[in-house]
């Protein structure tokens, strides 16, 4: 049995007399790790100094987590980067001059021969250029810009970029992107700097159109829709344009781009017009011909000329598609054409006038909901002629309401070839066969520049009092995964 007095003497003994236990570190160096020996926090560690291995003492590489597998080691583990004496002292003047010159010439060449809005990820196949390859908003965290489309292939004003990254929210990649600046930063940048040529000091590179999209850096959320420029002018930031600006940030500041992406995946917030500005807007440009129910019943005196627009649709399809595609569309039309004929053959002129009044009255009612829904929405007739375009749809695609409603425009004109074929097949199924009249589908929208935006959409078919398809209400959202 241990004597109590002996135990007390040991406890009261000075600490210096005890054997010192080396403090363990959570991360051993490569040599101590291989030898399974205790290491310390200093670099080089004491054991490496004793063995004359101080120059090569590094933290042992750790096994990467799955979500970091495609990120370079120097980014995933900054501690792996060790400062050498040369790095501490800095490069010589001649080296510094040469590297700065090369950086400037590289940026200038990139500006001349590439357009950031047409970056296409080689594996994702999403947002596309005019050559037909698909472009969906997908952002790449890679620094490889070899797949940038030459500027000569770009002939539009609004950028429609691609964006790809392997983060929680993936735009077939993902939109885990970098906010370019805080909202207040936009007003702090000098206009002449925004339009200047890129240089070694131009961190973010040249600004397209001289404006940066607003972004909440704390949530990585970009703002699209109606806004004001730095000089107070009203403007609309479209989805394709904002994506192109994100790609520009990724190109000119890739390290900062990756760092910010770790915070959260990108998201978008669609701004709404203020009450003051909405009162001043021309409501007729949405597609509404009548703004009061009394106007509808007093001014509509003739039926709508559906046959005329069917002929216009057929002429357009013949100009755009080859024979094989036309045959496929004709087969789909042949399925519902007899039902249309049977449903309308007994209708009188007053009935046809009444159906047009119902169409305009329904459109007027839907305008109240669409204008506050915040979802990109369009409405078209059974001839596929656009009858109503929501403001959010213009923000999503880059089309203006004047372009879509200033003339007779068909929904198939802003769909890619595959989506047009799918449209007729889908319409033939829901026109008379599916009395629920609503279906989810995936389609690809075209921007004014010919780029493609993959979207998921829901189409709701509305019938008139005679059971004949009257209009299709379609809601679109860009595909992020």
UniProtKB/Swiss-Prot annotation:
GO annotation terms (biological process): carbon catabolite activation of transcription; carbon catabolite repression of transcription; cellular response to starvation; gluconeogenesis; positive regulation of gluconeogenesis; positive regulation of transcription by RNA polymerase II
Start-end of DNA-binding region: 29-57
Keyword flag Transmembrane helix: no
Molecular-function GO terms, alphabetical: DNA-binding transcription repressor activity, RNA polymerase II-specific; RNA polymerase II transcription regulatory region sequence-specific DNA binding; zinc ion binding
Classification via Pfam families: PAS_13, Zn_clus
Family of the protein in this entry: Belongs to the ERT1/acuK family.
Name this protein carries in UniProt: Transcription activator of gluconeogenesis ERT1
Origin species: Komagataella phaffii (strain GS115 / ATCC 20864)
Gene: ERT1
């Amino acid at each position: 049995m241990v004597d109590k007095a002996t135990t007390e003497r040991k406890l009261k003994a000075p600490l210096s007399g005890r054997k010192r236990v080396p403090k363990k570190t959570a991360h051993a160096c490569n040599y101590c790790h291989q030898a399974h020996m205790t290491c310390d926090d200093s670099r080089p560690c004491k054991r490496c100094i004793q063995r004359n291995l101080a120059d090569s003492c590094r933290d042992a590489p750790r096994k990467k987590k799955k979500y970091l597998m495609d990120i370079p080691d120097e980014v995933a583990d900054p501690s792996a980067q060790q400062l050498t004496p040369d790095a501490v002292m800095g490069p010589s003047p001649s080296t510094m001059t040469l590297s700065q010159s090369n950086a400037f010439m590289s940026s200038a060449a990139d500006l001349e021969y590439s357009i950031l809005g047409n970056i296409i990820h080689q594996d994702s196949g999403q947002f596309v250029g005019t050559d037909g390859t698909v472009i969906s908003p997908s952002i790449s965290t890679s620094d490889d810009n070899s797949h940038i489309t030459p500027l000569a292939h770009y002939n539009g004003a609004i950028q429609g970029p691609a964006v790809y990254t392997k983060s929680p929210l993936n735009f077939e990649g993902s939109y885990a992107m970098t906010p370019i600046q805080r909202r207040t930063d936009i007003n702090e940048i000098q206009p002449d700097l925004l339009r200047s040529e890129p240089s070694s000091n131009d961190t973010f590179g040249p600004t397209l159109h001289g404006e940066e999209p607003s972004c909440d850096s704390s949530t990585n959320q970009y703002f699209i829709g109606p806004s004001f420029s730095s000089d107070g002018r009203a403007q609309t930031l479209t989805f394709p344009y904002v994506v192109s600006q994100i790609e520009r940030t990724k190109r000119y500041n890739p390290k900062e781009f990756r760092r910010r992406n770790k915070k959260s995946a990108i998201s978008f917030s669609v701004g709404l017009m203020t009450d003051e500005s909405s009162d001043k807007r021309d409501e007729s440009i949405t597609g509404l011909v009548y703004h009061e129910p009394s106007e509808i019943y007093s001014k509509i005196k003739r039926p709508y000329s559906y046959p005329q627009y069917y002929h216009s649709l057929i002429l357009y399809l013949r100009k755009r598609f080859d024979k094989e595609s036309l045959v496929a569309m004709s087969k789909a039309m042949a399925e519902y054409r007899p039902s249309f004929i049977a449903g309308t053959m007994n209708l009188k002129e007053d009935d046809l006038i009444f159906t047009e009044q119902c169409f305009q009255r329904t459109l007027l009612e839907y305008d109240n909901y669409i204008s506050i829904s915040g979802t990109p929405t369009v409405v078209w007739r059974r001839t596929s002629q656009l009858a109503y375009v929501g403001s959010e749809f213009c923000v999503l695609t880059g089309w203006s309401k004047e372009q879509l409603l200033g003339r007779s425009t068909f929904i198939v004109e802003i769909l890619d070839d595959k989506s047009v074929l799918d449209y007729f097949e889908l319409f033939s199924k829901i026109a008379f066969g599916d009395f629920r009249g609503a279906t989810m589908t995936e389609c690809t929208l075209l921007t004014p520049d010919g780029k493609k935006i993959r979207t998921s959409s829901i189409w709701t078919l509305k019938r008139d009092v005679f059971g004949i398809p009257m209009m299709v209400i379609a809601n679109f959202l860009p595909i992020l995964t």
